[in-house]
Amino acid sequence: MRILCFDIGGTFIKYGLCDENFNLLEKDKIPTLAENGGQSIIERVIGIIEQYDGIDRIAVSTAGQVDSENGIVVYSTDNIPYYTGMRVKSLIENKTGIPTFVENDVNSAALGEAHFGAAKGVSDFICLTL
């Protein structure tokens, strides 16, 4: 299984390719160009996806309040214009046909720490990002 993971931030879109054991096979980043708006960001992400073959899943971590079940940015600040209401999951899935999962960036960081990092094996912890 090959998983293409994205972290959409205000400055960079960071991405990496992982295998089924979550080994990082490669990574890179491109400028977000947030001032161009949410649709432009999703188009940049899709452009990256289209450079790869054999991707089984896509994971997207993004700033803002996220409805992770539906993959929608429920609320975002003005740092990324026209990002509130962006249907990230359906936009990517409709264009690529690849199952896509979307989560808030802080929740994603906490999940990473719980499974692979400082909180591994701990029942309770707090993840604070600034």
Question: Which role does the model predict for each range below?
Answer:
Residues 2-43, 73:
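Short glycine-rich, Thr/Ser-proximal phosphate-binding strand/loop in the N-terminal lobe
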Residues 63:
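Conserved NAD(P)H cofactor-binding loop of Rossmann-fold oxidoreductase domains
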Residues 52-54:
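Hydrophobic/aromatic-enriched cytosolic interaction surfaces used to assemble or bind macromolecules
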Residues 3-7, 57-59, 125-129:
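Short glycine-aspartate micro-motif
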Residues 29, 102, 127-129:
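Structural signal for conserved beta-strand scaffold positions within catalytic alpha/beta enzyme cores
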Residues 84, 129-130:
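Short, well-structured alpha-helical patches and their helix-loop capping segments
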Residues 38-46, 57-58, 66-124:
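Glycine-rich phosphate-binding loop and adjoining helix at the ATP-binding site
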